[in-house]
Amino acid sequence: MFLLTYLRRAGAVAFGTLLLFGAVSAFQRPLRLYPGFEYPNLPKDLPRDYQEKTEWAFARLMYPPVSPRYGGAEFLGSWKQGESNWTMDYPRSDRHLSAAVRRLTRVHARSVEQPVDLDEGDQFDWPWLYGVEVGHWELTDDQAKAMREYLLRGGFFMCDDFHGTIEWSFFAASMQKVFPDRPIVEIPNKDPIFHTIYDLDDRYQVPGALYLETHRTYEKDGKEPHWRGIYDDRNRLMVAICFDMDLGDSWEHADNPEYPEKFSALGLRIGLNYLIYAMTH
């Protein structure tokens, strides 16, 4: 039923996205691969479309982690070389959501992800940007400025997989650099982002894979999920904050029979709604 409903709308969506992002796609950088924190071995085989210029690809934010002296994890090497917080769930999560986009929408989407470095201006190639474990990021002043410019020009940033009071404080410190004059608010149920494709009034906490061991949907002191955001002056949502939940794991484990289907289903629906919202607003 959803697919039929979506296909009726998709002609306008696809046409609109072609107008908005068709010119941008001509300047997209080639695919870059990095060793991931969970998946350190680079894939040997890539799909045929891995270098195709498309309307959308899973654009994953690269960022410097919080210093170990302030409680950050100790990593070997530079965050610019992978195996840092920004690579959590990468690339499996990215490719599962990309497969859902290709299967359930008419958006011209690539099968593989694209790591994005704010220091190089990559963000302007993509209308939708995803950041994971942002309770561990520490943006520089220049990176915050680059993010602000991207968002005010029409970009969209979705962040996910951080939990509890301490991680929120680290997240908010860097986001305050991006928008010192804009508040973070709870997104109301009536916001179009919850009704772009799916009606998502009935939302619940989506846990990470740790749920399979603990049977708890929360981590640390983050017992209640929050869908928060930052709006521009025209009431467009620029930043969608998925706090005290782990949508990335729900995508990553969508094909794991032990991970409950209801969590993957909601996680994918939220991801698709946010993506289509980003490409049409």
Predicted feature locations:
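N-terminal secretory signal peptides that target proteins for export/translocation
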Residues: 1-7
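Aromatic-Pro/Gly-enriched surface loop or interdomain linker
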Residues: 27-128, 134-135, 246-249, 253-281
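Short alpha-beta junction capping motif
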Residues: 58, 123-168
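Bacterial N-terminal signal peptides
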Residues: 10-22
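Surface-exposed patches in mature extracellular/periplasmic domains of secreted proteins
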Residues: 107-117, 159-164, 182-190
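Extracytoplasmic/secreted envelope proteins and their assembly/folding machinery
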Residues: 94, 98, 144, 148, ...
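An acidic, glycine-rich "communication" segment
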Residues: 33-40, 66, 70-73, 166-248, ...
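A generic secondary-structure signal for well-formed alpha-helical elements
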Residues: 105, 155, 178-182, 278
